[in-house]
Amino acid sequence: MGRIVIAAFKPKPDRQAQLRDVVAKHWGILRAEGLVTDSPRMVMRAGDGTLIEVFEWCSAEAIERAHRNAAVQALWAEFEAVCDYVPLAVLGEAQHPFAEFDAMGL
């Protein structure tokens, strides 16, 4: 059974453009490695510049496989260089029942 995830990436100072580039290729690599479903992903931007990505892993096992996959690990290292992973609760938008974000065309 698929697993929906919502990931929030807060850019490090002066790393907004690099973060956008890494997020742009994230889903494609996961898909090429057979780890995510064909369901379209969504990418949004919060008011503070945090990027939010929503996508569906194929299974809990696929998530585990990602942690042993060289291509995914290399990409995640790129993420760590340009952002911090943050919980949704820190976003101002998450304090409202109907959180709204800017759509990103990635």
Per-segment meaning from a language model:
Residues M1-Q73, E80-L106:
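Short S/T/G/P-rich N-terminal loop/turn motif that feeds into the first structured element of a domain
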